[in-house]
From Swiss-Prot:
Species assigned in the record: Burkholderia lata (strain ATCC 17760 / DSM 23089 / LMG 22485 / NCIMB 9086 / R18194 / 383)
Gene label: fabV
Main function: Involved in the final reduction of the elongation cycle of fatty acid synthesis (FAS II). Catalyzes the reduction of a carbon-carbon double bond in an enoyl moiety that is covalently linked to an acyl carrier protein (ACP).
Protein name as catalogued: Enoyl-[acyl-carrier-protein] reductase [NADH]
A GO molecular-function annotation: trans-2-enoyl-CoA reductase (NADH) activity
Catalytic reaction annotation: a 2,3-saturated acyl-[ACP] + NAD(+) = a (2E)-enoyl-[ACP] + NADH + H(+)
Positions contributing to NAD(+) binding: 48-53, 74-75, 111-112, 139-140, 244, 273-275
Location of the active site: 235 (proton donor)
Length: 400
């Protein structure tokens, strides 16, 4: 079939398998052209491995450190008549390229929050890898079925203690509009912490540790975004911020747990990028469009692969890691450069419907958004007939 982008709200409902493969290849080429990661990991588990930062971690490990990788994700395969999810195609492409390079690459499709998927992962590590020396936690999910209670909990993006009104960008209609968010209830805050906080990360490490599949010296990191003053009311000081603070709490006990075997645990803070998750946050498209323009002007613009490869090379496995006073690894320091932030803040209130394309890089934002789904990739013929039914050999699919 010939596949064209069809966007509804903040989701593109079509995906392009050849475009997704080309996107993965671009990221692999970036890593291989920038050289190996000294003293990097060799056997890596990535939880949330199919898109965005998790995919970039899998690529950085496999192609920057010659690591064998096991990826966990929740995606949908395509059929002859309907495209699958971008994450499915990304993972198929990653496995193809990693296998060609002689690296082990296997994937588990299912609910990473569940006890069952944790057990399947442990069994697969025991059978195929023995032990892992790095666990990357990169889940972005709107809801979670708690494995102990069976209750399905949802996360909420809301301020705490006050109503907040801010500028938003309607990306469909390409108009600016004010968005008002009512304060979260305590139940909504608790739900957001349960979905996006550190409990599941802790459960994963506990399960892996008890099963004896963590190597001596094993490291773990969970990816997060903190943002700057302009987003704080709905982010750091809101319901999602409470989940981020929970990560900061949980990492302390995980760090103690791994330190007993010479290992370490860190929260890694990454910059704002276009993802399916960030495009759903009302103020992020405008913020990202302004940020992209400013960072491209200063020559510091980065996407997922540049961020994660740099995090691995400089901080996770580097001699002089970028660490903040909370003990987090920081890869977002170029975004938080005071001059960059000052320019974003200065332009924030001056953007109008008429000058949107002049004051911001909304064009770049839209391109990055479509690239998530395999569109707008250089060298891909989007008029060609493609087969949306792409197999992942050896996948362990717990959803069927």
């Amino acid at each position: 079939m010939i596949i064209k982008p069809r966007v509804r709200g903040f989701i593109c409902v079509t995906t392009h398998p050849v475009g997704c493969e080309a996107n993965v290849k671009e990221q692999i080429d970036y890593v291989t052209s920038h050289g190996p990661i000294a003293n990097g990991p060799k056997k890596v588990l990535v939880i949330g491995a199919s898109t965005g930062y998790g995919l970039a971690a899998r690529i950085s490990a496999a192609f920057g450190s010659d690591a064998d990788t096991l990826g966990v994700f929740f995606e949908r395969a395509g059929s002859e008549t309907k495209p699958g999810t971008a994450g499915w195609y990304n993972s198929a492409a990653f496995e193809k390229f990693a296998t060609e390079k002689g690296r082990y690459a296997r994937s588990i499709n299912g609910d990473a929050f569940s006890d069952h998927v944790k057990q399947v992962t442990i069994d697969t590590i025991k059978q195929d890898l023995g032990k892992v020396d790095l666990v990357v936690y990169s889940l972005a999910a709107p809801r979670r079925t708690h494995p102990k209670t069976g209750e399905t909990i949802s996360s909420t993006l809301k301020p705490i203690g006050k109503t907040v009104t801010f500028r938003g960008l309607d990306t469909d209609k390409e108009v600016l509009r004010d968005v008002t968010l009512e304060p979260a209830t305590q139940e909504e805050i608790d739900g957001t912490v349960a979905v996006m906080g550190g409990e599941d990360w802790q459960m994963w490490i506990d399960a892996l540790d008890e099963a004896g599949v963590l190597a001596d010296g094993a490291k773990t990191t969970a990816f997060t975004y903190l943002g700057e003053q302009i987003t704080h009311d709905i982010y750091w000081n809101g319901s999602i911020g409470e989940a981020k603070k929970d990560l900061d709490k949980k990492v302390l006990s995980i760090r103690d747990q791994l330190a007993a075997h010479g290992g370490d645990a860190r929260v890694s803070v990454l910059k704002a990028v276009v993802t399916q998750a960030s495009s759903a946050i009302p103020m992020m498209p405008l913020y990202l469009s302004l940020l992209f323009k400013t960072m491209k002007e200063t020559g510091t613009h980065e996407g997922c692969i540049e961020q994660v490869y740099g995090l691995f090379k400089d901080s996770l496995y580097g001699a002089t890691p970028h660490v903040d006073e909370e003990g987090r690894l920081r890869a977002d320091y170029k975004e938080l450069d005071p001059q960059v932030q000052a320019k974003v803040v200065a332009q924030w209130d001056h953007v109008t419907n008429d000058n949107l394309y002049e004051l911001t890089d909304f064009t770049g934002y839209k391109t990055e958004f479509l690239r998530l789904f395999g569109f707008e990739i250089a060298g891909v013929d989007y008029d060609a007939d493609v087969n949306p039914d792409v197999k992942i050999p050896g996948i362990i699919d717990t959803t069927v």
